[in-house]
Structures are given as C-alpha cells and as structure tokens.
A protein has these predicted regions:
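Metallocofactor- and cofactor-centric catalytic cores in central/energy metabolism, strongly enriched
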Residues: 122-132, 356-357, 549-557
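Flexible, active-site-adjacent loop/turn segments at secondary-structure boundaries
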Residues: 82, 271, 344, 535-538, ...
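Glycine-centered flexibility sites
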Residues: 347-350, 460, 538, 551
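Contiguous, well-ordered alpha-helical segments that form the cores/surfaces of helical PPI scaffolds
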Residues: 344-357, 378, 535
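Conserved catalytic cores of very large enzyme subunits
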Residues: 1-340, 361-362, 366-528, 532
C-alpha cells in the first residue's frame, strides 16, 4: 500500500514509517489531546450507552477512564488529559455542594464548611486513586495498557489544588499492597513563575510535593510554562509522551489545543547519511535532501490515508467530541485536520552519531560541530514550514522517542557499514539531540548544551532528562535543576534509582545484565518479586516484566549519572 520508493526506503533503513501494524492498513490517527472538558460537559456516547454530564468527581473520573479506553482503541498513539485539575474542579465542587447541604441538616453551623471540605477532599483523593487504578488495569483493543498522560499544575482554586495534591499523593503511595511504582498515567506537572516556582508563590507547597513524588516515583516530569509558550506558541501538555502541538487559533480567533491530534511520524536515519557521506559534508547535504524528499512523500501519504477515514470508523473521536467537534456520520473528517489544526511529524535520530562521523566522538564542546548539528535541525524545520504552506497541514520536527528504532537503525547500519567505533559499536543510536549517555556532564551542563535544539526548530516533540543518584533525602538538589531548567528547556524528566527487591528489601539501582536487570544484593531477577523502573525514553517502563529491545537495553545500561551520590537507598537484608 505504501508508495514503492517509500516502502523501499523503510525496508532498507533510510527512513522509518512508524506504526506499520496500524497504518496505512487503517486510517487511524496517532496521538491527541482529548477534549475532556467538552465531553464531560456535554455528554457522549460509547457503544449504545448515552452518557450524560457527571454529577460528582467520582463519576467524572469513571467517565474519563472509559473515554481513554475507547480513544486508545481508536488510535495507535498516546492520549493526554491536559489541565485535568482545572476541568475536573467543577465536578468536585458538586460534591462540595452536596456535602454542604447535608451539613446544614446534621452539623453545627460553625463546622459545616470544614465538614464539607473534609468530605470533598476524601472524594477527590478516592476519585484520583480510582482513575490511577483504572488506567493501569485497562486494556485497549490491541491488548495494551493505554499510553496516557495527565497534565496538571496551573489551577489555583481550593478544588484545583486538592486535585493536584491527590494526583501526587496517590502516585507516591504506589499500587497494591507492595506499593509498586505506577507506570501509567505519565504525570506532567507545570511549573510557572509566580504560581509555584518560587518559595513565595501560592502553590509552592505543591511544587514541594511534586519534588517528593519525582524522587520516589520519577514522575512527574515537568513543563516550564513560559518556555513551552516561547517554543510552541501557546501553552499545552504534550500528546502522549512528547508530541507538541503548535499554537493554533480557530476561525473565530479562539486558541484551541484540546481536541487536536497528530497524524503520524516518519523518522530519518541521520547517522546513515553521515556514514554514507564518508566525511564529506557537501555529500551529506546532498543525500540529506534526497532523503527529505522521500520523508515528505511518506508524510503526505500518511495525511492522505488518514483523510480517508469516516466518522463511523471512530465515533468517539469524530462524532462524540474527543477531537473537539461532533461530526455527522457522513461528514468529511478532513475539516478537523486541515488549516494546520492537525500536526504530522518528521522525526530524526542520532545527531550525536552524525557529528561523531565528522568531528570525533567528543565533539560536544566543539562549537563548529554543534553548529553543524543545529543546521541539520534548522534545515528540517525550514523544509517542514515549506511543506506546511504547500499542503495546509502542520508539518513539525519531532525528536523521535526511538524505543525500538534505536536498535533497528543501528543494526541495519552495522550490516551495511560494519562495526564503527562510537557509532555502530554501541549497538544503539543516541536519541534525537541528547548528550552522549556515556558521558557525565553536570545536569546544568547537559541542559545548557541541549536547550539549543528545540530552539533551533525541534518543537514538534522534545524532552530532556538528567540522570541522578538516589534523591529521596535530597529533594533540594532536584529543585535546583528544575529551577535552572525553567528558562532554558520546556520539558524535563527525572531519572533516579527507584528499583526494589521484595525478597531482600534492597532499594536503589539494579545491575544491568545481558537479559535485563538484577538485584545487586541477592541476585533476584524474578519480575514477580522485583520492581524495576527505567525510563525507556519519554515513558517509564518495567523492563523486567516487559523486556525491551537489545539496543534500548544497551543504551539504558550505558547511562551514567550527572550528579555524584549514592545509587542505593537501602542495601537489603542478607538472605
């Protein structure tokens, strides 16, 4: 079904046409920001069930879980509930009004408000805990847990603050009797100057709770409110793990984020172009232009295929509000995509390897080398802007997560070029613009180095992360990095040792093995009695329960800490 030259380029490893098990066989979309606010306010339909607007926060979160399950079965990428604290607050307020009415009948007047707040606080906590359990026990039509993210942190009312606190408290507690770390939903907390960033700001206490949560559970990742606006044109959480919409206004001049979507990704194998050019930069740019032409054709094909959908293919998306509008059964779905409402993404991998071909493996402090890599990002951005003008869809530059692609491209290039030192010999390619994981700059040096790449045009998808020792006794160290990052990067993740062995009670960093990870104290590798949590890239993963591809395992094993300190919280018992 793919154009022959696109299929050939994919099979050879020049490009990667993502999610071929779903697209183009089906006209599915990739990821989205679900319009929960509109769906909860106006009701929706799933199957034969007409669902009306909820009358409590418990019912609202139950409806959210059903929407997530249905949306995740109707697309192949992740979905995000952006600003969940704000859109759930009206339903928490309904709980409060009910409890206040009860209090007027049974509680002394001076205690009524305290009673209503205490009952509402418990309702909020229970609702958010139920949502966390629901998401972790849901399965989509393809048998996976939905890739879900919750964006929160900007609310200022009592209800919004309580929802923020409950999300973090539930995650800190953990899942089940063993209090395991929840992998889903991904938590994305927004930092904002004047709101929660500084000690004098009104929501600073919630930032402290977010720091505690990140030291114990790695999530939440954090968004820098002002930097996200600077990079993308408006504030919003990413769709799924890292895909960002650009700022966009409808025909009435109203800014719209929720209800928008991404139509798919095609990724360029940049290290291959560098290897093929044999150190000749003119040759590099010549091959680059040719591959960009193939990528363009692949992306245009993605758009054309998705446009062939009918609302009846995915009623939850097109007819019942997930995509922000309610189309008739026979309406043209393209009205939700065109005029740049939807994005389609040009991905890339391996800027580290590209520069290593031309400048050697320790090029990060070489200004000429860095300028070369930035010119690659700028060239992709300029091409995407031209394609956007030509086709009226928003083509964006996307820093591909490469969960498995890091392995595939490197493996294919090893077959073609052999074992090349610092490039294919590692058995993985470095994600997007990231600093070589084998090196140990400080967190500040790493972020200072990486910040230029989204600024150069990689705004359709990006994330930065730093590797830390155990931080639970030192949250101020993490706060220092968050504060430093605020004006520099838009999106930051925390990687810290939180593995646990339930046989000997060891807590800290498990030891990588050829097949997975092992408790360094007792040697336990049984996924039933260990909880190993690693950042696959954008999302966290349980590699002991669900092993990852060899290349990604090699990359995780090669990571070094960017800060000194112990990687062990508790050494464990001697068995």
């Amino acid at each position: 079904m793919l154009p022959p030259h696109v299929a050939n380029a994919h099979q050879k490893g020049d490009i990667h046409f993502h999610d071929l098990d779903y697209s183009p066989y089906t006209p599915m979309t990739n990821c989205c920001l679900i319009d929960f606010k509109g769906m909860l306010a106006n009701g929706f339909k799933i199957g034969n069930a007409e669902v009306e607007s909820p009358k409590s926060i418990q019912t609202a979160t139950a409806q959210i879980s059903q929407i997530i399950a249905n949306v995740a079965s109707s697309q192949y990428g992740g979905c995000t509930a952006d600003r969940i604290d704000e859109f759930l607050a009206p339903y928490a307020k309904l709980n409060y009004k009910k409890h206040l009415a009860d209090a007027k009948e049974w509680v002394a007047e001076e205690k009524r408000e305290d009673y209503a707040r205490a009952k509402t606080r418990k309702d909020i906590y229970d609702a958010m805990q139920s949502l966390e359990y629901e998401i972790n026990t849901l399965f989509t039509s393809n048998g996976q847990t939905p890739f879900t993210s919750l964006g929160f942190g900007l609310g200022t009312s009592w209800f919004e603050r309580e929802i923020q606190k409950a999300i973090l408290q539930v995650r800190i507690l953990g899942l089940g009797s063993e209090h395991r770390t929840a992998i889903f939903p991904k938590l994305i907390f927004t930092l904002k100057r004047g709101l929660n960033l500084e000690p004098s700001s009104p929501n600073y206490d919630i930032k402290q709770l977010a720091l505690e949560c990140a030291t114990k559970r790695m999530y939440p990742d954090v968004l820098s409110y002002d930097k996200v606006i600077e990079l993308t044109g408006s504030f919003k959480a990413p769709m799924g793990c890292r895909s960002f919409l650009q700022g966009w206004k409808d025909e009435n001049g109203v800014e719209v984020n929720s209800g928008r979507m991404n139509l798919g990704v095609v990724t360029l194998n940049l290290p291959r172009i560098a290897l093929e050019s044999k150190g000749d930069q003119d040759k590099f740019w010549e091959i680059f232009e040719e591959r960009m032409g193939i990528a363009k054709d692949a992306l245009v094909y993605r758009v054309e295929r998705v446009k062939e959908a009918t609302p009846a293919n995915a009623p939850i998306l097109y007819q019942y509000g997930a995509f922000g509008q309610r189309l008739g059964k026979f309406d043209n779905v393209d009205q939700l995509f065109k005029h740049r409402r939807a994005t389609v993404s040009l991905g890339y991998i391996g800027l580290y390897e590209v520069a290593s071909v031309f400048y050697g493996s320790d090029w990060e402090t070489n200004l000429e080398a860095k300028a070369f890599t930035l010119n690659i990002v700028k060239a992709m951005k300029n091409a995407c802007e031209g394609w956007s003008d030509e086709y009226d869809y928003h083509f964006s530059v996307y820093s591909t997560p490469s969960e498995s692609l890091t392995d595939r491209f490197c493996r294919l290039d090893t077959e073609k070029f052999g074992v090349v030192t610092d490039i294919t010999d590692k058995e993985y390619y470095t994600n997007s613009f990231h600093y070589d994981v084998r090196k140990n700059p400080t967190p500040f040096e790493k972020l200072e180095f990486e910040k230029a790449y989204p600024e150069a045009g990689a705004t359709g998808g990006f994330i930065h992360y730093c590797e830390y020792p155990v931080l639970q006794q030192n949250p101020k160290a993490l706060e220092a990095v968050w504060d430093f990052a605020y004006d520099r990067v838009g999106y930051l993740g925390t990687n810290t040792p939180i593995d646990k062995c339930y046989k000997c009670d060891f807590e800290g960093d498990f030891t990588p093995t050829e097949r997975g990870f092992m408790c360094p104290n007792c040697g336990n590798t049984d996924p039933k009695t260990v909880d190993v949590v690693k950042r696959t890239c954008g999302y966290l993963g349980n590699p002991q329960a669900r092993p990852m591809v060899k290349g990604r395992h090699k990359e995780i094993s090669a990571r070094v800490k960017h800060m000194n300190g112990s990687t062990i919280k508790y050494e464990g018992k001697h068995l």
